[in-house]
Amino acid sequence: MIFSSAVAAFFSTNAAPFILGIIGGLLTNFIWQKWRDAVEKNAAARFSQKVSERLVHLSADFKDEILLLDSAGTHYLAENISVQVDEDLKFLVPCQADDVRAIAEAARGKAKPTAIAFEKDFVVPRGLTVEAIGSSMGIDHFRERLIAGSRATAERFVESYEKPGRFGEFNGKSFFLRGFTRARDPRGGDERTTFFLALGMTDWFTGLTLYNVYHQLAAEGHGIVHADESSISEKYNWFIRGFGVNVLAILHDGGKRYVVFSKRSGNLYNMRGKSRWHVTTNEGLTGQDLESDGRLDLYACAERGLREENGIELRPMDAIRFYSFFFLRTDFELGILGSAELRLSQAEFSKQARALARDNTMEIRQYAFVEFTERAIQEFYRRETEAGEEFTASARLGIEIVSARNGLNRLNT
């Protein structure tokens, strides 16, 4: 009786309609939010499924050049990418004494001594030998192959200082693969993918030497050329001597979006003597990206690449997103593909690249700004290839993957 009287008294007041209106509004908003979340979740699931189907076809089409190791349906979360380095685990190839002298003579007055410092003997993890490492990969005469490969690398160093138009090679910290694992959150959502990469320490000279040995083995028809995901991580991991962060910049300019391709110098080792169209920035992980806890930050590496190669400092509204991990067969390297959304005009980008980029004159010959539409990208690709220009596999796969995440149809690059 008392409760009924209280209810009746409430409804007789002037405040009742107002309070009921607030409650009704909150309830309506709650129901609307739940419905919208469900619609967006279903749309994201359909989009993720569409992207996954597209990636299956891309993986098959690029299988001779690139092996896709993992892809997020939307994009990776920063906390779900882990790169750990064991600084005590080292694999280093020496530079022969006479080659060291030849490099020093060619680089006299052009390079600091620390830039051309090399190991005097092989350095391998405790309990292993060079021969044992070679045997585990089914490679005979591995020590002799490495020494021969090191001499070819030394010749490259000498030429880089002697030939006009070349920039001097230098040695520095780099990393080799110990292994990688991946996992997907059972709660669902590809954005919850976790990718863990374990690395050991090496140097740039060793990396180039392994690059030479790999191509020799490939010419001999060694099984390394058919490496799959398992053997890359567990058998031939010693040859993974680099990790590249590949980013395509997308400019927001005058209400339109433009993707930026860079034409890389043919003097770069992975261009093999011919300038090619590539992603906007391709930065390798180095000692600069190593944090005090032994971890590497891929986002920091991408930001450094944009700054050093393109003169771009990220602004608060800019965003870097990573989509796919891959293995580049032609160079036996691991990499990650992503995009950088930049609030910059084409003119601003060009101005900053000319004025602020540290590596621009050495590595990049020119830029191409292409409207981010299927028709414009396809026309640019057709025009350039008909003119005899080439695109790297990373650039072709990269634009396909970035386009897929932005709702564009297959480009067939």
PLM region descriptions:
Residues 9-25:
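Hydrophobic alpha-helical transmembrane segments
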Residues 25-304, 312-413:
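N-terminal leader/linker segments that precede catalytic domains of diphosphate-processing enzymes
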Residues 1-11:
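Short, strongly hydrophobic alpha-helical membrane anchors
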